């Protein structure tokens, strides 16, 4: 299980998708779980702390079941709370946490939907990084700042970390 966490616009999904493709190229069975895509299927999940917590735990449970059946799971979710991510870590046989720590200023610059601006104007509440906290991982396996490296460089670092941590390759 490779779990990407970070602010909206940090580059989590971009790098995660690239890593998933690299793993598929190696012949691995891979499933990509993206937080936004899952929310589109289950729109009743809101953004309060308890709803976010439940969402992360549900996705984590699904990921753990896929992992149990031999699928390499690549998940990309904001997953802002350390406790939720630690819960998911406990469900999985292997858990590689990738903290995409791109500065909020860069995340805002990349925000094509204008969500950060809406949150700053008070039009959106409970927006992670603005009026809801993001709890950075205490001991992630890897920290990436995508404002300082290309997608290829970030993906290569993830692949190195996976191989070292999980023994893939």
Task: Describe these PLM feature segments.
Residues 1:
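Walker A (P-loop) ATP-phosphate-binding motif of ABC ATPase nucleotide-binding domains
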Residues 4:
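Hydrophobic anchor at the beta1->P-loop junction of P-loop NTPases
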Residues 8:
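The conserved Walker
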Residues 12:
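Conserved lysine of the Walker
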Residues 17-64, 68:
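Conserved substrate/cofactor phosphate-moiety recognition/catalytic segment
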Residues 41, 45-48, 63-120, 126, ...:
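ATP-dependent NMP and nucleoside kinases share a basic, alpha-helical "lid"
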């Amino acid at each position: 299980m490779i779990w990407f966490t970070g602010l909206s616009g940090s580059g989590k999904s971009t790098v995660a998708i690239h890593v998933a493709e690299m793993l598929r190229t190696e012949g691995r069975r891979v499933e990509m779980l993206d937080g936004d895509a899952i929310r589109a299927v289950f729109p009743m999940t809101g953004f309060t702390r308890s709803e976010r917590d439940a969402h992360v735990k549900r996705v984590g449970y699904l990921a753990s079941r896929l992992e149990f059946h031999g699928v390499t799971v690549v998940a990309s979710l904001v997953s802002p709370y350390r406790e939720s991510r630690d819960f998911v870590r406990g469900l999985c046989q292997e858990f590689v946490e990738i903290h995409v720590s791109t500065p909020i200023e860069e995340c805002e610059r990349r925000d094509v939907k204008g969500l950060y601006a809406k949150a700053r104007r008070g039009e959106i509440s409970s927006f992670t990084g603005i009026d809801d906290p993001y709890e950075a991982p205490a001991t992630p396996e890897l920290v990436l700042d995508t404002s300082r490296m290309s997608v290829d460089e970030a993906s290569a670092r993830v692949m190195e970390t996976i191989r070292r941590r999980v023994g893939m390759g």
